[in-house]
Amino acid sequence: MGFLTKIVDGNKREIKRLSKQADKVISLEEEMSILTDEEIRNKTKAFQERLQAEEDVSKQDKILEEILPEAFALVREGAKRVFNMTPYPVQIMGGIAIHNGDISEMRTGEGKTLTATMPTYLNALAGRGVHVITVNEYLASSQSEEMAELYNFLGLSVGLNLNSLSTEQKREAYNADITYSTNNELGFDYLRDNMVNYSEERVMRPLHFAIIDEVDSILIDEARTPLIISGEAEKSTSLYTQANVFAKMLKAEDDYNYDEKTKSVQLTDQGADKAERMFKLDNLYDLKNVDIITHINTALRANYTLQRDVDYMVVDGEVLIVDQFTGRTMPGRRFSEGLHQAIEAKEGVQIQNESKTMASITFQNYFRMYNKLAGMTGTAKTEEEEFRNIYNMTVTQIPTNRPVQREDRPDLIFISQKGKFDAVVEDVVEKHKKGQPILLGTVAVETSEYISQLLKKRGVRHDVLNAKNHEREAEIVSTAGQKGAVTIATNMAGRGTDIKLGEGVEELGGLAVIGTERHESRRIDDQLRGRSGRQGDRGESRFYLSLQDELMVRFGSERLQKMMGRLGMDDSTPIESKMVSRAVESAQKRVEGNNFDARKRILEYDEVLRKQREIIYGERNNIIDSESSSELVITMIRSTLDRAISYYVNEELEEIDYAPFINFVEDVFLHEGEVKEDEIKGKDREDIFDTVWAKIEKAYEAQKANIPDQFNEFERMILLRSIDGRWTDHIDTMDQLRQGIHLRSYGQQNPLRDYQNEGHQLFDTMMVNIEEDVSKYILKSIITVDDDIERDKAKEYQGQHVSAEDGKEKVKPQPVVKDNHIGRNDPCPCGSGKKYKNCCGK
């Protein structure tokens, strides 16, 4: 309890501090009101000049603190003149919390959009760009259009970054003082910027300050979603079909175990025996069978943990993911690690080819790259530990402008779902008779449709808002607070949209929110409740539960069922028990804890690739931004030669076989016969290096003489292609390592430590391969020039669920590389995808 008291006291102290700062802002109201419009814009210019004259970010931060009261007061005056709205003291407090890099928790209807204008304006003055991030393009467009009036009045520019924009339009949007965008588009633009070949193809500036609307949705609910830019991999889909056939043959408990609490499924020993017989294996868990085990486990998940119309829907032969937090389908998105293909096999639709990852990043790692990160939402306090541990953000609960008048009634618990739904319908009919608007919240599409059928039988007119008819969302939400309105919504009672009460509804008790089941996250329940009682309106909320609900089943409702039976309670009699409500909340906390642990575990694994990604992207950017790459190329060639001598020339042996070393030199650096054994025989390693290096230098200068004006361009192209090719292969290898690493725990090994160690070794090997590739292609290519060849564009790699059109840019002439020698480990030119030595070079 001491810890909780500290949190509560801490919030009170913070509110007191913010309140004092807000008073300073309000005290400047009169001073600002006498300024002309032009004088207001001149103030903005003066702030900008003062800040932008200082290049040191920490010194800029001090200036921002000094000018905060005046800048916030200026925005208040601007809002008054442009919108005829003056931000309340609580909105100023919320704005200061956001400026401090924290999360401002503000209830629904408290005006988060207007709150964000003050810290956005203040931080945009530094000229480094502020990103205002929303969950979808509709909100980004509407907010940017609305708020641009205010920012333009104050003298700042506003950009809107959409998926459909060209490269030039995107760059323009990012160069504005304030940029509105979705989280997806930002992540993909970052990845694409790190796949370009020329600096002028980049669209983003360095990541400075981001304000995330609905921050819990993006940083918690979407944290595990990787953004992936991918190309198609040439892998057969037949194993998905075989694994699906196998999974459907299995019997629960005999062949596999399903854990309700963790939603995990795994084969029993008997199931493993069946797998060995079907796939003709000696030992299913042998490491060489990782691919088969992975496909079997994926088929088990698809068949026994994911439900159609709950986790996904099938529309026109396509599997669409349903977002469990919003109830919306997510067209274009696919489950990763082969799970989407496994569901396609399960549903008998066409199995799409697996894709090969070219670049990827999680939201956790993307957003941690900003110098400063802040957010706002109506529900964040339950996840404060995660925000603090992973993002170093504190949650500040901002008081409401008017007292909350919503009545949150105790849960009603029934024995069966039938009893629960009958009671829900009776409650709806009763309230509907007097005209009170009702919002019914469900956790699944099928539940919303079941309740809809029950209400139709009772003659109650209503709207259904779920993944199947989400296109009417704005229209349905806009009328949900009108007299007599009944709305059934699946986890999606419109984040970012307010339900406003119609005329005469206040007298009827306001909006009644009825939850038909507890969600596994308390935040989603709080969001549903928060639809009612906005800005001091009257309202009420109540949850109806049954012992057959998924959350209750997962966390043991047998004891309660027996207790209710002993009390002689029938299906129509609910209990209203604080003990049961506490048990439900305890179950939710356990699920939230499990989910937090899973996100932390993913972050630990992702940390390995994050560090490697930073090295590779840093190397690429250095190549792109430097005038010449010759120094780097020569360093790579020398390093490759030095390694080869250390490996092949063992000075401790009496007789050294120089043939393997000469073969390597001919394969990578020089042509056949250019190095003879008698030139290096009997020499020490240093002398051998000098002898061979002299010949390599000559070959390098000869290549340079072929295209003196374009040799820099040639080197840059070879470097980027070598890095990109090896990096995409490395991502694929790391993905395979990660999928199979859990098997190590059976051998009493630490999977994470093994992943870190082996990932490090794989990265070192990749860097060696890059240096060898660069050496070979620089020294052994026949070079001609073709002015008509266009640059490689990042758009060649199609985003997994987002892609952007590139602008039409003037193309620099590029060298054409014709390799006159095929190494044994090179891809075979016949196009089989195999190595040359395993194909035509046998």
From Swiss-Prot:
Compartment(s): Cell membrane; Cytoplasm
Pfam family, one: SEC-C
Record key words, sorted: ATP-binding, Cell membrane, Cytoplasm, Membrane, Metal-binding, Nucleotide-binding, Protein transport, Translocase, Translocation, Transport, Zinc
Membrane topology summary: Peripheral membrane protein
Binding residue positions for ATP: Q91, G109, E110, G111, K112, T113, D498
Molecular function, one GO term: ATP binding
Details of cofactor binding: May bind 1 zinc ion per subunit.
Region (Disordered): 798-827
Compositional bias segments (type: Basic and acidic residues): 798-824
Protein's GO biological process: intracellular protein transmembrane transport; protein import; protein targeting; protein transport by the Sec complex
Name of the top EC class for this enzyme: translocase
Catalyses which reaction(s): ATP + H2O + cellular proteinSide 1 = ADP + phosphate + cellular proteinSide 2
GO CC annotations on file: cell envelope Sec protein transport complex; cytosol; plasma membrane
Principal subcellular localization: membrane
EC number: 7.4.2.8
Cofactors that this protein relies on: Zn(2+)
Binding residues annotated for Zn(2+), in chain numbering: C828, C830, C839, C840
Cited function: Part of the Sec protein translocase complex. Interacts with the SecYEG preprotein conducting channel. Has a central role in coupling the hydrolysis of ATP to the transfer of proteins into and across the cell membrane, serving as an ATP-driven molecular motor driving the stepwise translocation of polypeptide chains across the membrane.
UniProt family annotation: Belongs to the SecA family.
NCBIfam families for this protein: PRK09200.1, PRK12904.1, secA
HAMAP family per the UniProt record, alphabetical: SecA
Record note on quaternary structure: Monomer and homodimer. Part of the essential Sec protein translocation apparatus which comprises SecA, SecYEG and auxiliary proteins SecDF. Other proteins may also be involved.
Miscellaneous: Complements temperature-sensitive (ts) secA mutants in B.subtilis but does not function as well complementing ts mutants in E.coli.
Name listed for the protein in its UniProt record: Protein translocase subunit SecA
